[in-house]
Amino acid sequence: MTFQQNEPSAVPAQSSLSFTQGFLLGQLSVVLLIGAFIKFFIFGEAPPPPSRGLSHRASTHRRSNSIYTINPNEGTSRSLREKPSTSNVLRPVPSSATNTRSILRKTYYSAIPTNPSGKHGRHRIHHSSHQPESLDWFNVLIAQTIAQYRQTAYLLKDDPTSSILSSLTAALNNPEKKPSFIDKIAVTDISLGEEFPIFSNCRIIAVDDPNSDGGRLQALLDVDLSDDNLSIAVETSLLLNYPKPCSAILPVALSISIVRFSGTLCISLVPASTPPLHTPSPSPSPPTADGAVNAGIHPTNGSREPTQEAPNAQEESPPKTSPKSNVAFSFLPDYRLDLSVRSLIGSRSRLQDVPKVAQLVEARVHSWFEERVVEPRVQVVGLPDLWPRMGRTGVRTGEDSETGSNAASRSAMSADMGNSLRADDIGREPDGLRFRGLGARPPFDSVSRTSSFNVETGGFRSHSMTREGSGGGMSDDFHMPGTLPGGAAAN
């Protein structure tokens, strides 16, 4: 009986001990899990971002072997054993380097032809599957450039040869293009506007081009300009020359304003080896630098005499100008150009805002625009020379001054360079934008470097803009201050 009474009392002690061990083990496992979570998920280091270096590109993107990596041992042995000639110093460019698909693959731009179309003439456009890109940064740069053009045009408003007023007056009164029944045209008001064009929805497409291997790439940008006061006002008179000259005179005043312009801008590169684009415009093309060389117009120096006849000049001295890459831009035919034309006809009893006059002016402006920059016609502008040169090196205002040794060496170099440039390039026009003042500017030396910010993209020129005499076309006489290079020649 004693054994039976003591046996049930030992069971609760063993069960309580196992419960305590299990409870402690569970608490310990929970603490370990919480500690591991805090260590590895909260205080752990984040994985490094994917690198776009050369090693990452080589591991993630499979690239086709070029001619330089086909057999490196063979190339090394050949370069050590054989002495390369002068013509073999520059390694050949692979044929696939300029291919459209190769360029898109190496730049990681997906331009898969998902929707081939036969629009826009003979070219077949391959639309890209890449998402359209924003152009906010590009809008800021374009706005700064246009603002600088407007400021430059205003600073030169009193210059008799370089002002926009004199340029427009000379262009409108060109005797070879102005009809005889129109009297002298006087510009009474010019407004260059205050707003800026907004570019958006940029996309790259592939266009079939028989002149290039694999087609060519073309950038499409949507542009919109609205709510601006870009306008010009002129006054003239209509002359009745029958039965005798100036039998009757009818005064006419016109004002043309751009209300809104929107369209799609197409930009593409024209390689130097590509033949010039065919322009079906009936008007003869204006003379260019290359055309002047081909026509026998050569710079006069001490060792060469000016040529007299164009055929002999072509046979004796072929053109030595290197080929130059160009940028071609145009607008698609679905553009929108809204104009506001106001007219005032007569001297005593005047007719105001005649609808027929507005229709004629709008039709003429649209025709002028379509003959120059609407597909299939394009404007071709040469790319500027971006090689760093001392002749166009400047120092921003407020930067640290130069040390004595650097200033002395640069001043001596600029003096020697200035003498040679003044002897050779004094009559050469710059190829791009140059910030000019109203008065004459001192030579570009170390003093002017530290006092102001001068940017030059071409040769030296005088303080006033000059127009060279030409055949008398509107494109030859019309030169707007601050325009893009080649813009006047394209007209």
Curated annotation (Swiss-Prot):
Task: List the Lumenal topological domains.
Answer: 1-22
Compositionally biased region (Pro residues): 275-287
Q: Does the keyword Iron apply?
A: no
Question: Its membrane topology, per UniProt?
Answer: Single-pass type I membrane protein
Bias class Basic and acidic residues marks the residues at 422-434
**GO CC entries:** endoplasmic reticulum membrane; ERMES complex
Q: Which family does it belong to?
A: Belongs to the MMM1 family.
- Designated name of the protein: Maintenance of mitochondrial morphology protein 1
The organism named in the record is Aspergillus flavus (strain ATCC 200026 / FGSC A1120 / IAM 13836 / NRRL 3357 / JCM 12722 / SRRC 167)
Per UniProt, what is the name of the gene that codes for the protein in this document? mmm1
